[in-house]
Amino acid sequence: MSDLPNNGILVGVDGSSCAKLAVEWAAREAAGRNVPLRIVHVAYPAVGAWAGWGVSPAPLPENFVPTQEDQARKVIDDAIEIVDAAIEGNDRLPVSSEILWSSAVPTLVDLTKQAQMIVVGYHGRGALARGLLGSVSTALVHHAHCPVAVIHDAAQPSAPTGAPVLVGIDGSPASELAIAIAFDEASWRGGDLLALHAWTDADWPDFPEVEWSATKATAEETLAERLAGWRERYPDVTVRKVVVYGYPARHLLEESKSAQLVVVGSHGRGGFAGMLLGSVSSAVVHGAGVPVIVARQR
């Protein structure tokens, strides 16, 4: 991003269908931003089977390690093929790949310290339920040191022409970073920016209409102030604004149906630096059918 260290896009792969979509999305993202792409497959190192208390590990089956290495190389080779197809004709994009023998979560979290963004599939090969966020993806959206793009298996890496980038804004520091990312995304994608601001995170179904009318004007003014400087920096981006009084997750999910990408902060007005994923962001990551970028701060 324009205001973040330019260390490229990192994508974690494991051979799953979601990871393959993540690779394609990451390749287009890196090409659009003209930044390096780093493909990483983290495989748990081979160890002998544990037979019980006080018993030495059982030996590994013959050819287990070579087979595991072959499988790891295939994951990387398949990912590189996807990248080549996604950026066909662009031979200027620096692409690197590597296999790391370690535990996936701490390794990827540590790698995010040097990344501009990490891209992961919504769930990996180990997902027991297709509708659940995978353990690696969950850890990254909670603990990564850079923004995290989560790609659903229903998402299309090539977004529909004219679809906007949707960003949720609440005035928190995390949403300020989300605004920066969203403007940058909309600019290089050539799309509009749809900025949605909820006056409150609360769900107030009986809020008096006359009072909301007055409050809405104040909320619209606040949103305009939040966007003013960014609109000057990105004059090529057309901005549309939506102000609602509450139910931010519900409204973001509804608007995401016609968006190509959603950007949300890692936590909202009630959060604090370093806290876990906020309720609104969590609902969007789980419920959106398009790629979602969680604007995690360093």
Language model regions located:
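Gly/Ser-rich helix-loop-strand patches that form or flank binding pockets
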Residues: 5, 23, 28-32, 105-158, ...
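Conserved beta-strand segments of alpha/beta enzyme cores
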Residues: 94-96, 147, 192, 238-240, ...
